[in-house]
């Protein structure tokens, strides 16, 4: 077969990209379940990466939290030989190249995270495990593809999405 093009994406961190929205994600010093929505290429993963770091290290709005990250496609941590190449914070545990639903279950059962962070929700199985995590007192931080809240609601189930996420951040260009 002939190759018609090659697309190489290089994950990199941009520190401080979450600074402006961070205060909106807390209520009375507690991080609120947050969903980030945007079309591809708008910076969801970059924003997620910086939010994970700031939640883990602590910030002006709350103390550092234990964050569990399921990095299914190795985009968040950029792990190489088991070591994250991007800074996700000092209290972050990363499960690299692990399916989201399985990784979230492993984190819940063995790592006692205060926050679970995942990129690109979509599978029904992911949503079931997220619901289980939220029911167990774990905070959620996730992204989903969509042009806005309506698209995200169609993908995740509108009532379910609004019940699960107290904050919905929509990135527009």
Label the predicted regions:
Residues 1-33:
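P-loop NTP-binding catalytic core
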Residues 36:
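Hydrophobic anchor at the beta1->P-loop junction of P-loop NTPases
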Residues 15, 19-20, 94-102, 121:
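A general structural motif
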Residues 47, 51:
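Hydrophobic positions on the alpha1 helix immediately C-terminal to the Walker A/P-loop
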Residues 40-41:
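The conserved Walker
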Residues 44:
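Conserved lysine of the Walker
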Residues 111-173:
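Conserved P-loop NTPase nucleotide-binding/switch module
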Residues 56-107:
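P-loop NTPase switch/communication element
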């Amino acid at each position: 077969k002939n190759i018609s093009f090659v697309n190489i994406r290089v994950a990199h961190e941009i520190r401080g990209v979450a600074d402006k929205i961070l205060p909106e994600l807390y209520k009375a010093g507690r991080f609120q379940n947050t969903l980030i929505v945007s079309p591809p290429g708008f910076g969801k993963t970059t924003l997620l990466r910086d939010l994970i770091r700031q939640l883990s290290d602590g910030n002006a709005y709350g103390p550092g939290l234990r964050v569990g990250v399921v990095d299914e496609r190795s985009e968040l941590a950029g792990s190489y030989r088991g070591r994250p190449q991007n800074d996700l914070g000092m209290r972050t545990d990363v499960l690299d190249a692990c399916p989201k639903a399985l990784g979230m279950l492993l984190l819940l059962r063995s790592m006692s995270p205060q926050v679970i962070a995942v990129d690109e929700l979509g599978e029904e199985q992911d949503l079931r495990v997220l619901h289980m995590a939220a029911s167990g007192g774990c905070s959620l931080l996730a992204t989903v593809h969509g042009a806005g809240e309506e698209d995200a609601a169609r993908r995740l189930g509108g009532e379910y999405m609004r019940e699960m996420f107290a904050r919905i951040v929509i990135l527009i260009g």
